[in-house]
Every structure is written in structure tokens, then in C-alpha cells.
Amino acid sequence: PRVALARNAQGRIDAQAWFKPAPVRAVPATGKLAQPWAVTLADVQLAGGSVQWKDAVPAEPVNLSIDALNLRVQNLQPLAERQPDMPVSLQARVGAGGTERADPGRLTIDGTLRLPAGDAGLSLRSQLRAERLPLHALEPYFADRLNMELLRADASYRGSLAMSQSLSQSAPGLTLALAGDAALEDLQAHTRAPAEELLNWKSLQVRGLRLNMAPAQPLTVAVNETVLSDWFARIIIDPEGRINLQGLVKPAEGAAPSTVAASPAPAALPPDIRVGPVSLINGRVLFSDRFIRPNYSANLTELTGALSAFSNATGTPGQAPALADLSLKGRAEGTATLDVSGRLNPLAQPLALDIKGVVRDLELPPLSPYSVKYAGYGIQRGKLSVDVAYKIAPDGQLTASNQIILNQLSFGDRVEGSTAPNLPVKLAVALLADRNGVIDINLPVSGSLNDPQFRLAPLIFRLIVNLIGKAITAPFALIASAFGG
């Protein structure tokens, strides 16, 4: 059998017009209640079915196809007041309608199903096997919550599924339990305006996933291991100084105020999230700073690292969650080496971390946009090595040390129109460099991340400018003191 279903922009499904409502007939008062019908279908089977679903309600229509549909239900009693558990099995291929794909996703369900009756809604307990289901086909349903376009994402899951819907007034809601392995593969996401590559990866494997949710209970999520392979991320600081990844999910719009007084809704219980070791394999990050003029971009490649287990749980009330061990290695701009290590917790609120980073032999000329903004000169040649240590306390207090080694630094001519202080930076470089042309600078930095005026990069460059000023004036101060000036 083949079925084509469509929902128009007004939300009406065309199948609703297939059946005419039964005429209302008066029931004679006999004084006796009619015996309810009892129907039992021992075995119902459907083979080789297909379903086409088109939905015009979202701004971008949804087009989904299901074929090779095989369904078997046993002990079906549709009129029973108390529904039995019915053995059910389903196999199907699922594809995104309108796209050419040789191998669509596959879905297999094998378990028991119970139909709604009384206060009990639909319930299902089964083994579920989903292979490369086209999640991107459903993107129009949540597109209004995302500041990105999901071009492709294939979702897989293998494990158990238990779900039930309660219709009772005392504890209504959905109960869901998952236990198995999940994957999100071949993800491709672009920014909306302008359309630029934003995120992609070959494989995100989530092994040993356990998820439980129930009415009036906290959401619990536990993962044994996570592996992200062959991934890319574009990180952009926009002209207003915002980082693009912070705004990928739009905040929920507030509900319209009600004129009717209502009892406050109970506060949602905080979730319990526990994540095992995370591995990052063969990553690449393209960093673009559009806050600086001219713009600056850097390409980080061969990024491989690991993060140990972490959670949002606290040992005692008021105590921050424990930090996880971090290690990350890679290359910057193809030649410089990058090594990051330390401790952090992505789930900690507020943010807390203690990390160290080492960069060796980064070519300096690409950093000219920063030197033009803060020193007024472009960079002709030189290499940069950096040892940094950053520690952020739960109260937002930052303590950082920055050891900066500049090797064979050479500035060009002053850039016309630069608003940076007009300092003789070439003289300062000559005074700061040793006999081998190496400048070694140590810049401690501290401040509060809760201060909206606190910006780390400009602060470091201002410190360098101040250091240049001191380097220039120091020899003359020494000469003046020698002659009693």
C-alpha cells in the first residue's frame, strides 16, 4: 500500500477529508446498557508499504519519505477498555524527500506497544535500531530556534527505548528512557547570512548513552564515552565583539503576559549530567576576527586532544563542580605548534578553568592587523612564541601570565590613518631585543570577567605599548641620572 499525506499552511491534514462524520442518531431509552463490542485481531501485517509526508506549516516545507515499510502487530484489541501489551515489529527505510541518496536511513523497532486508554496514553517498550536517519529533513520544524542552516545530519541509535504518556491530571507528561549508543554523522551546517561553512564533522559517536526523563523528576543524562572525528568549526568575532558560537541557539521568546492571576509554575529541577571521556580527532578551526580592522584570520589544523570525565554535580551545596583534565595539540598556520593543557569543566556555571597554552614559531606578519590597531605599524617579519597560563575562579576573577618571545621582529612603515599612539616602535624593538634579536616579555594580567569593559586582547596590546614606552625612556632616564639630571 502507498499513502501520500499532506498538511497545508493552515494546519489541516488532507486525510481529514477522506472520511465523512457519522450522522447523529437518537438512541432509544431501553433502560439497559448495551454490551460493548469486543474485537481481537490476532495478527495484523503490512508489507512493502510507503508513506509520503509533506508539511507546508513550517516556513520551509518538510518533505519526508518512508518506504519498504513492514509492520506486524499481534493481539490488537482496539475497543478494549484496558489495553493489552501488543507485540509489534517495524522495519522501514526513511529518506528526505526531494534529495538524491543511494542509501536512505533504516529504522527497526521490535517490542511491545500499548494503545491509549483512560488516563494512560500511548506506551512503547522496544529495541530500537536507527541507521543514518536524515535529521536535516526535520530542520524546518526547529529552524526558527537556530541561527544556522542544517544542510545534512545523519542520526543513528542502537539500544533500548521505553516511553509512555500519562494523561492524568495529577502527573501528566512524557516518561522516556534510552540506553544504548548514538551517533551523528556527516553533519554540515552553514551560517544564514552570509552563508558560510560553520560546523561539520565526519562522525560524532556517543557510546553508553543513558537518558531518563519523567514528570516532576530531574532529567538525567550519562555518557560513557564521546568521540568526535574529522571536524571543523568556524569561530568568528563579529564587528560588535560577539563570538558567533554563542548565538547559534536563539533564546526562547517570552510568553505574553496574562491578565488572569495564576499560581506560579513549580521550578524545574536541575538536570543531572555526567559525561565520560571525550576524544577529539583530526580537527580544524578557522578563526576570524572582524572586530579588528583590517580583519584577521588564523587557521588551526591537526587538532587532536582529550577531555576527561566531567559532570554538573557538586560535592556539597555551594561548591563548584570538579574540573576535568584537558589536553589538545595541533598546528597554527601550518608551521607553528600548539599545545594546550590544564583543567576545565564545560558544564560548570559560572565558568571556571585552569589551563596553559604553548605556541612555538608562529609567523608574525599575519598578525599585522593587531599591530596596526594598537601600535600603528605593520609587521614585515618575525616569529612569535607564547607561553600563557589562565586561571578563572568561579567568581569570574581572571589571573593570567603571558610570556611572549618575539624573534627577529621587524616593523614596516607607519600606517596612515592609524589611531594608535605615535611611538617610535622601531627604536623600542632595538632597545628590547638582545644580541640575537630576541625580545622576551612577561605580561601578568588580572581582572574580572564580570566587568563588561574588560577585554583581554586589547589589554595585552596596551601593556605591550606601555612596555615600548618604558623601553624608549629607560636609556634616557639612565643617562640623566648618571649626570645628575
Predicted regions and their residues:
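Transmembrane beta-strands of outer-membrane beta-barrel pores
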Residues: 2, 50, 94-96, 115, ...
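Low-complexity, intrinsically disordered
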Residues: 90-94, 328-332
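Amphipathic hydrophobic-ligand
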Residues: 10-11, 58-73, 97-111, 136-163, ...
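Outer-membrane beta-barrel proteins
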Residues: 28-30, 75-77, 161-169, 208-215, ...
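Outer-membrane beta-barrel architecture
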Residues: 41-43, 85-87, 123-125, 154, ...
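Secondary-structure transition motifs
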Residues: 1-71, 148-152, 173-174, 189-305, ...
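Extracellular/lumenal and peripheral-membrane lipid-interaction modules
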Residues: 2, 120-161, 192, 226, ...
